[in-house]
Each structure stands twice: as C-alpha cells, then as structure tokens.
Amino acid sequence: MAELDQLPDESSSAKALVSLKEGSLSNTWNEKYSSLQKTPVWKGRNTSSAVEMPFRNSKRSRLFSDEDDRQINTRSPKRNQRVAMVPQKFTATMSTPDKKASQKIGFRLRNLLKLPKAHKWCIYEWFYSNIDKPLFEGDNDFCVCLKESFPNLKTRKLTRVEWGKIRRLMGKPRRCSSAFFEEERSALKQKRQKIRLLQQRKVADVSQFKDLPDEIPLPLVIGTKVTARLRGVHDGLFTGQIDAVDTLNATYRVTFDRTGLGTHTIPDYEVLSNEPHETMPIAAFGQKQRPSRFFMTPPRLHYTPPLQSPIIDNDPLLGQSPWRSKISGSDTETLGGFPVEFLIQVTRLSKILMIKKEHIKKLREMNTEAEKLKSYSMPISIEFQRRYATIVLELEQLNKDLNKVLHKVQQYCYELAPDQGLQPADQPTDMRRRCEEEAQEIVRHANSSTGQPCVENENLTDLISRLTAILLQIKCLAEGGDLNSFEFKSLTDSLNDIKSTIDASNISCFQNNVEIHVAHIQSGLSQMGNLHAFAANNTNRD
C-alpha cells in the first residue's frame, strides 16, 4: 500500500502525457519523481513488473539525470519481438486467373492462324526450305555491304556518329520499289541456281560463288521426311515423304501423309526436311573434282541390229510401241546418239524397277497387316500366307531379271568408259592400283622396321597387303565424294580375289571377320551415291 501511495494519481499522469506530447515537462513533475528514476529498472525477459523508464529532456531527447548518482545498468535493453513472416503459398484459386488468361490468348491465337492471310504470313515469316535457309538466315544486306566496302574493318563496336558516317558513305538504299523487288528476285534465283550446281558437282572452280554462304546444304534423298507447301485447292504446309528427285527441273516428288492429298511435284525451294539438314563447306566442292560426264556426247558406236529381236517380240510394252518399226529396222543404227540395244535395256530396266516398286509397296502393306493381326493375337490365314509367299517369289524373280539387265547396261558403260577417261572392265581401276601399291609399301615398311623381316612367309605378307589395300580403297571411296560405279565395284572384285586365294578352311573365317563388315560399309556408301544396284554381285552373266 505504501508503494501505491507513492505513485502519482491519474490526473497528474494525464497531465504528464499531455506535456510530453507538447514537448515540455513541468519542473514539478521532474522534481517529484526524480528520486524514483535515478535507478531505472528494466524489464527482463521473464519478469512481468511495470517498466520504469528514465525521464527525457523534451528538447534534446537525452537522459536528464545525474550520472554520478545514477547506477548504469549493464544489461542490454529488451529488444522488440520480431514478427515471423510466414510465406504464403499460392493456392489454385490465385493461379486460376493466369491460366484462364493463357487459355484465352491461346484460343485467340488459334483463331488468328485460321485466317488465310495470317497463315500465309506465318509461312512467309518462318518457313524456309533447305536451299533458302542459308541464304535468308545468314548475314543481311548491310553486313554483306559492310564487308565489301570496308574489308579492313574488324570491329563492330562503333559510336553512333561513326555508324552514321558509314551509312552516308554507302548511300541511301531505295526499297519497296518495283525495280528493287525485281532485282532481289533475280538475285535470289541466281543464288539458288548456283547452289544447285554445287549440289550436283557441275562446277570445278568455286571462285565465282563468293556471294554464297560458307555452308552449302546437301540435296535431299529419297525417303526423307519433309514438310512441303501445296498450292491451289489445298493451300498450306503438309508433311510427307520424298519418292523421287528431279535434278533437271529442281523438283521433288512428294507423297503426302494426309489422306486425299496424294503425290505432287514440289519445287525444291518449297520443301523443308523434318530432320536436321546436312551441310558442306563451299571449299570442299572445289576439291577432288572429277570430270563430269553429264554434258559429254556419247560415242556413236557402230551397231548392227538383228533382223528379229526376241526382246521386242516377247515384251508387250515394246511390242505395242509405235517405235517398233523404227527400232527393228535395219536403217537405224543409233537413236539419239545411243545404240538401240542399249535403249531397249534401259526401257526394260525402268519397267522392272516400276514393277518392283509396286511389289515392295504391297509387301509393306502386308507386313503392317501381319503385325496388326499378331498384336491382336489373331491367327494368320493360309490365304494370307500364300499371297505373301507369292509376292516374295515374284520379287526374287524380279531381282534376277534386274541383275541380268543391269549387267548388260553395265557392259555398255564399260565400253563407254575408255572414251570418258576411265579404265575398261578387264583392267583394275586406277584407284585400286594406287591403293595396292601403297598397301604393299606400308606392309613392307612395317615388316622391316627392326631391320629383319617379322613375317617371312610371302603368302602372309601378300594377304596382309591385300587386306590393307581394301581399307585404303574404302577410305578413298568415302573421301572421294562423287562415287564412281566402276571404282565402287572394284572393292567387290578385290574381296573376290582375296577369297579365291585363301585356303578353303579359312573361307568361313574370312566371311565372318572381313566380308560381312565390308558389305555393311558398301551398303552405307551405296546409299550415298545410289550405286547399290550397280555394285551388286552379278551372278547371271549369260
């Protein structure tokens, strides 16, 4: 009770608060309660007593007490309790508006792309064919002009004044005029034609192609999955597969995946490969060039046709042809600069390939049907097996006929070879001869590296030399670029020569360790140059 009597009454406390707010304390207040504030009592962490704060000077906010009489407390004052900020998790209700907005934007974008003009705008803006991609995605006209006008300018970090000076020196370009558009179209056509010539290896000097990019795209091959543009009724972009390549007209024959579109001939500047396109440095086209036989006139060999040709009589296609009288006549020895017999074999070859393509298509459809039946655990009928076996037997017979015709066509090519600077059929090619000589030198040097021959048996050293020559031939064929059918077939001839010299007990080992691997390499090389048919072993040589 004594302590309660010493406390000020409520009215005096209110006056003190008002005076504190006004910025001054009365002297009576300070004198009356100075004794109570000499030793301030700070509230501890676990105490619940009232806090007795020292009075402050309203002017300078300093402790107004006698430092000599007041005992300084060394304990640190109580810190304000920090309010822990708990991160709020975004609930589904908070992200719902964003999701709805995204869906709304997606619907609007889809509706926009349905418009014909918007669809064409997307095609013009982002669809670039393989032949146009390096032309449009390379350096722009300003960069090209900068390289030509200022070849010694190595930096691109210039000030605004310096860039303005360069633009004034270049002159102001006139764009969006009829003359400008005509000039741009003409330049684009010329660059496309130059790329086609490089793709077909019809140039020997690449100094005239400095305006082209450094990387030239390779031509697309048969079987490539592509996206092509159709015009007319079905105007738009559609996926499909290349079935044929026409280098003369620079077009591709594309069979589209969508039902009802069928097969169309599409120019190469409207066909884009779905797979990453392969490129080749432009400098590589000027290396190891071989003389092109495309523009050479075939020799007019003396040819005397027989009075009656069994091929014409037995072939229904040639038998009904209006050219039969001219072909079988004794007055005509050549037709278009080619012997008639050669043209007949080429016609038969084209016919057999067309029939074989149809059989392969039927076989593919039957394989799909068989896989479907197997997936449903359904039995395969006897009729289905009979039809499948019939197609397989017909394909086997077609392959035999194809080998016969190919052999006859190849024989004519052998006769044509000396006039084109190649070796005839009964002589090894120059590449094979060079590889054999280099292989013998390598084996001889490796065998006598220590001063004494490591292998004294001549048959073994000869076998090692021939096997090394095969490796060198494969290397030359892979680096040659433009594959030659005669040099390609020389690889098979080298294998046959080695196989004929080894012992019969080692033939199985040779087939498993050498021949099968070379066959895989031949398959890959033949796909590069489309020489698989001419490189096949022709067993029917009648």
Curated annotation (Swiss-Prot):
GO cellular component: nucleoplasm; transcription repressor complex
Residues forming coiled coils: 354-413
N-acetylalanine modified-residue sites: 2
Record bears the keyword Nucleotide-binding: no
Pfam families: DIRP, LIN9_C
InterPro entries: DIRP, LIN-9/ALY1, LIN9_C
Locations listed in the record: Nucleus, Nucleoplasm
Modification Phosphoserine, positions: 65, 95, 309, 321
Residue positions, PTM Phosphothreonine: 96, 304
Disulfide bonds: none
Keyword Nucleus: yes
Main localization, broad class: nucleus
Chain positions covered by the region annotation Sufficient for interaction with RB1: 2-296
Subunit structure: Component of the DREAM complex (also named LINC complex) at least composed of E2F4, E2F5, LIN9, LIN37, LIN52, LIN54, MYBL1, MYBL2, RBL1, RBL2, RBBP4, TFDP1 and TFDP2. The complex exists in quiescent cells where it represses cell cycle-dependent genes. It dissociates in S phase when LIN9, LIN37, LIN52 and LIN54 form a subcomplex that binds to MYBL2. Interacts with RB1.
PANTHER family, sorted: LIN-9, PROTEIN LIN-9 HOMOLOG
Designated name of the protein: Protein lin-9 homolog
Source species of the chain: Homo sapiens
